[in-house]
Structure formats: C-alpha cells, structure tokens
Amino acid sequence: MSAFVEFQHVNKVYHTGEVDIQALNDVNFEINKGEFCVIVGASGAGKTTILNILGGMDSLTDGKVFLDGEEVSAYNKRKLTGYRRYDVGFVFQFYNLVQNLTALENVELAAQICKDPLDAAEVLAEVGLKDRMANFPAQLSGGEQQRVAIARALAKNPKLLLCDEPTGALDYNTGKAVLKLLQDTCRNKGKTVVVITHNQALTAMADRVITVK
C-alpha cells in the first residue's frame, strides 16, 4: 500500500538578493492515512516550510510531493487553489477568527466554500463548544478560540489537517486538551493529522514522529 503523504527528495532554496538559503535539503518521508504525525525540530529547521509545501502555500525547488496518489508538487495555480480549498484544513498558532462573527458563523463561513462540508453546529459540539456557539471570539478563552479554529478546519471535511504550533499561544493544560482533541479527531474520524511543533514532549502522542534537523 502506498503512503497517503509522501515527500521524495524535496529541496527548497530561497533566493534573497545574491544569497541562497537552503531551507530543505533532500527531505524524504511518508505518512499513512489516518496517522497522527508530529514533525519536530528546532526553530529554523524547516518545519513550517514542509507544512507550507504540503499545504500548497509554497512551492518546492525540486523533488516531488504526493497526497493520496496525486502529485501535488506538479499542480498549476488553479489546481493548487482547489487543493487548498477542498483537501487541506489549516490550524495555526494564531486563531485568525473573524471578530464580528459568532463561533458558529466563523465555522459556517469556512464550510460555505467546500464541496462536502460537515454540519458546523455538530462540529462545534464535537470540539466541546455546544454552549458557546453564539459567542463572539472576544468572549472566548484562548483554548476555546483554538477549538473554534479546529472546528473551522474540520468543517471543510479535508483529507488532511495541518497544524502549525497549534498550542503555541496556550498554557500547558489548555494546550494538552487541544492536542487530545486533535488526536481524537484523527482516531474517530480517520483523518490524517500533521502537527508541527518545537515541543519534544508532544511526540508521545504521535503514531509517527518526523524529526527535522
């Protein structure tokens, strides 16, 4: 069985003036469908570059990237836009919620652009916010706002959930609860979840750990 996510000899070089910065050097890894994968490494090691390439937000210099048998790295701009919209859900360290929309409206907004969205209210209930749907972001704690952001990503019903330091702005216990939520999502919904972090302690929760040096 071929891997669900595959990086083959991926290189990324950023050109800044006369200086070339090698962000990724011959990166190879596989992630199977339904795995909870944690990518760890020091700041500047290239973790976010990997996530941006996998999420279709950045291009590689050479190599190949596959998702579900499709060579994402060969997509043109139009196909990449569709890929980001339909196939990938994103969760970032900062929640990026629309402040004048309720929790429910924030999730519904994301669901509107998708082919096969999940019910926004049901997803919010699943992440523990059944009683907070009518609240605005300013009325929610950091952990609750991150749960709205996770619900927003899940409501798209993506093939892949990408999380960049999702607990970075949260205290330890809140962060742990958010990670447990991501892990449960992976288990219960069969989603493939990739979490980028510098926190080695999170590796204990993972099905697969990828260390970037």
How should each PLM-predicted stretch be described?
Residues 4-7, 11-212:
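ABC family nucleotide-binding domain
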